[in-house]
């Protein structure tokens, strides 16, 4: 694995949703670095990628309430333990659970293993509320997938908050877990 600046030079074998991610970041003037890798399906693999990226790789959890009427994307450091009961109480929601894959595709155009804050660019009707753990906000860089789990990127957390989220018309709620 090798850290590279910006978008891939050759994009013929890349999915359109990945290219749209790079297009968005480039349009916003967000500097980012990228590493290509085998599919990252576990946090253990992500931790190896983290060593190359030198960024906080987040657990990105796609959650919903019992009625499947409210949807949340939670970003927490990979080192934190997640308890649905605690988060549900903090945001005043009925007990949260993991969302069905079809909602991931419908709202974020992503599949399990590729969940990313950058998927919010596809949520044009704001079905998903972003929740960010305070420790993620304290990190200089955030690491995430460009809507596909065979690449990972890092960029300044401040760019996420100040450029990316406003551009995709999403705000966030800070949580302490």
Predicted features along the sequence, with ranges:
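Extended, low-hydrophobicity, polar/charged segments
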Residues: 1-177
């Amino acid at each position: 694995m090798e850290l590279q600046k910006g978008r891939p030079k050759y994009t013929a074998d890349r999915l359109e949703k990945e290219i749209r991610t790079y297009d968005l970041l480039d349009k916003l003037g967000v500097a980012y670095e990228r590493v290509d890798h085998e599919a990252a399906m576990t946090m253990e693999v992500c931790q190896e990628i983290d060593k190359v990226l030198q960024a906080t790789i987040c657990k990105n959890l796609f959650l919903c309430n019992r009625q499947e009427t409210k949807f949340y994307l939670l970003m927490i450091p990979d080192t934190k333990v997640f308890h649905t009961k605690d988060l549900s109480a903090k945001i005043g929601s009925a007990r949260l659970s993991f969302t069905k894959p079809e909602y991931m595709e419908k709202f974020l155009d992503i599949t399990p293993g590729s969940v990313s804050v950058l998927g919010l660019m596809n949520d044009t009707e704001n079905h998903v509320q972003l929740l960010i753990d305070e420790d993620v906000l304290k990190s200089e860089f955030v690491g995430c997938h460009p809507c596909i789990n065979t690449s990972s990127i890092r960029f300044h957390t401040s760019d996420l908050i100040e450029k990316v989220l406003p551009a995709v018309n999403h705000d966030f709620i800070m949580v302490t877990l």
